[in-house]
Amino acid sequence: MSYQDLKECKIITAFITPFHEDGSINFDAIPALIEHLLAHHTDGILLAGTTAESPTLTHDEELELFAAVQKVVNGRVPLIAGVGTNDTRDSIEFVKEVAEFGGFAAGLAIVPYYNKPSQEGMYQHFKAIADASDLPIIIYNIPGRVVVELTPETMLRLADHPNIIGVKECTSLANMAYLIEHKPEEFLIYTGEDGDAFHAMNLGADGVISVASHTNGDEMHEMFTAIAESDMKKAAAIQRKFIPKVNALFSYPSPAPVKAILNYMGFEAGPTRLPLVPAPEEDAKRIIKVVVDGDYEATKATVTGVLRPDY
């Protein structure tokens, strides 16, 4: 699919990787999960991102996952492949492999983690990937996970690269507003923070790359529709009820909460891979009460006052 198809996407789901109890990928669980997403307003799907537990997936496993999902999706929505690591050479090699594999609208490359590069180092990292790739690149800027932050100024330098088409931004609404105001016209801005989606869309973002859309896609779609129709009273009312659900979804290291909910809903999401562990049973029950049942009293026993902890 093309850039234009991607531009139409408002809700892109950062897809989990379903696992068997032994830690192997449960490929048989993928069709039901994908059909569930598509039935609840997912416009595009990101594979092998953070929510997919990509740090614990080998590249061979990622390619197997890509093939399985592509077979089910069959061109119905655009797909994005997670292609970046903290090793520029490895990222280049893998993005070339994914481009040759085919079937993706773009590749998502994360800001290098652990190395703590300078702004110039980050610029050169993404430039090298984009120069080498036949696949358009979206940058993933999430300092809560990688420690360093790609500044808006560096992002705008990269936005001028013809093969860097967008960013998944997980910094601040102030940064997002600055980027939206100063970016090239065709550069795509997605928030990666479910709790910020309401504000980001009102600022002019193109959409959200979401975890919550696994479980709350309908209300996200309803909120975005209300924003598009300038019904801010309705959109704000949805957002107020949505925030406790986001709090619950990120009250334990992700994707453990969303996997607990999907398992409860009858989908075979399975466990997480170490070093991540499932949410404790009592915590999982509270999370489910909030996210599925809308039991806001249960929020008193979950993380409150934040939209998304730095998990």
Swiss-Prot record:
Any one Gene Ontology BP term: lysine biosynthetic process via diaminopimelate
EC number: 4.3.3.7
Metabolic or biological pathway, per its Swiss-Prot or TrEMBL entry: Amino-acid biosynthesis; L-lysine biosynthesis via DAP pathway; (S)-tetrahydrodipicolinate from L-aspartate: step 3/4
InterPro entries, A to Z: Aldolase_TIM, DapA, DapA-like, Schiff_base-form_aldolases_AS
Protein name per its UniProtKB record: 4-hydroxy-tetrahydrodipicolinate synthase
Reactions this protein catalyses: L-aspartate 4-semialdehyde + pyruvate = (2S,4S)-4-hydroxy-2,3,4,5-tetrahydrodipicolinate + H2O + H(+)
Reported function: Catalyzes the condensation of (S)-aspartate-beta-semialdehyde [(S)-ASA] and pyruvate to 4-hydroxy-tetrahydrodipicolinate (HTPA).
Keywords for the protein's UniProt record, in alphabetical order: Amino-acid biosynthesis, Cytoplasm, Diaminopimelate biosynthesis, Lyase, Lysine biosynthesis, Schiff base
Signal peptide: none
Entry annotation: catalytic residues: Y140, K168
Gene Ontology cellular-component terms listed: cytosol
Gene that this sequence comes from: dapA
